[in-house]
Structure formats: C-alpha cells, structure tokens
C-alpha cells in the first residue's frame, strides 16, 4: 500500500482550496469547486489511505484529526496557506513548502521549475518557456506540462500564455486564469 496522503483545506477570499501532501511535500493543490469545496476532488492514486480534514467537520473533530497529522505536514500546510494567500493578494511568496513531483517526467519538472521563476505580474509564452528550458521547439510539450501541473497557483502555470498574449488553456478553467492574472494586475 502507498504511504498515506494527508488532505487539508485552505480557506481564502477566492474559496476553499484543497491541498494534498505526501511524506515528501505538497503533491497537489486543487481549486475550489462549487458545492464540493470541503472535500478532495482531484486525481486519486490507487488504494491510498488518507487523513482528511474537511471544513464540514466540527471544530472538536477537526482538532482531534489535526493531531494525527505529522508536524512536518502541518508546517508545510502553513507554508502552503501563506504562499497561496500571498499570490492571491498579488504578491510574491517568501517561502514555499517542499513540492512532491514524484512520478512526473524530467521534462515536466524542468518546465515547472522554470515557471517558478516567472515573477508575479509577469507573463511568458509557451515559446519563451521552451527556450528557458533549452528546448526551443517544445512549445506544445510545454503546454502539456502546464496542463499536467498538479500544483497550480503556487507553480504559476496561469502566467504562461499562448503566442500574442492569447489566454490558451488552463486546468482550473479560463475563469480562474483570468481571475489569477487580474489579481496580479494583468488584464487581457
């Protein structure tokens, strides 16, 4: 059986995000979902066990379950919450939790590391990202890596656009992409 994942929520002015942690760090961050914001609704990996703190749980129940969460994950969750709220406020985060990209390709990891270097309020094209990772003809593959990003917002795939500043796609939906860019002072 796989090591357990811990699923925790983060309440923001934009809704309740769902963060999923492994023993190595933040593995996924999911956008709020209408009517299901308090439960995990991302990609599942087999028969994993989970510790889940849903917002609908009572305070007493949540406090009891929080004690089951390893201290390292509680610290990572605090860093995730702080970074997420900073980005949503249009600021650069000072600290990130460790990111768990286990099972991802080296190409995807290279694209995501390059995305982490895009400052808040700035954008890059898929072509510019391909050049940044020394794969100038891999624009479409960069788009695929953006779509496969399991930690959107913190790994800012919303800052990557198609040529001529066209919005392109976004795993969280185009409304979220517009919203995130607007929060960073960018209007398209």
Question: What are these regions, as identified by a protein language model?
Answer:
Residues 136-139, 180:
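LysM (lysin motif) carbohydrate-binding repeats in extracellular/periplasmic proteins that recognize
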Residues 163-188:
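…primarily DNA-binding HTH/wHTH and HhH modules…
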Residues 153-160:
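Short Lys/Arg-enriched helix C-cap and helix-to-coil transition segments
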Residues 77, 81, 150, 174:
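Short amphipathic alpha-helical/adjacent loop interface patches that line ligand
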Residues 140-149:
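Regulatory, non-catalytic segments
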Residues 1-136, 187-188:
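Basic nucleic-acid-binding alpha-helical/helix-turn surface characteristic of O6-alkylguanine DNA
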């Amino acid at each position: 059986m796989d090591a357990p994942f811990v699923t925790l929520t983060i309440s923001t002015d934009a809704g309740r995000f769902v963060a999923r942690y492994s023993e190595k760090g933040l593995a996924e961050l999911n956008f709020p979902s209408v009517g299901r914001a308090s439960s995990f609704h991302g990609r599942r990996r087999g028969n994993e066990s989970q510790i889940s703190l849903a917002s609908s749980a009572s305070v007493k129940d949540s406090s009891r379950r929080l004690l089951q969460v390893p201290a390292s994950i509680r610290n990572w969750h605090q860093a995730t919450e702080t970074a997420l709220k900073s980005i949503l406020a249009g600021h650069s985060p000072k600290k990130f939790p460790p990111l768990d990209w286990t099972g991802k390709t080296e190409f995807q990891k290279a694209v995501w590391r390059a995305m982490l270097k895009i400052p808040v309020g700035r954008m890059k094209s898929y072509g510019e990202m391909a050049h940044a990772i020394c794969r100038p003809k891999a624009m479409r593959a960069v788009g695929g890596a953006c779509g496969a990003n399991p930690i959107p917002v913190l790994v800012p795939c919303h800052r990557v656009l198609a040529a001529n500043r066209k919005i392109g796609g976004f795993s969280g939906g185009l409304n979220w992409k517009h919203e995130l860019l607007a929060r960073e002072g960018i209007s398209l």
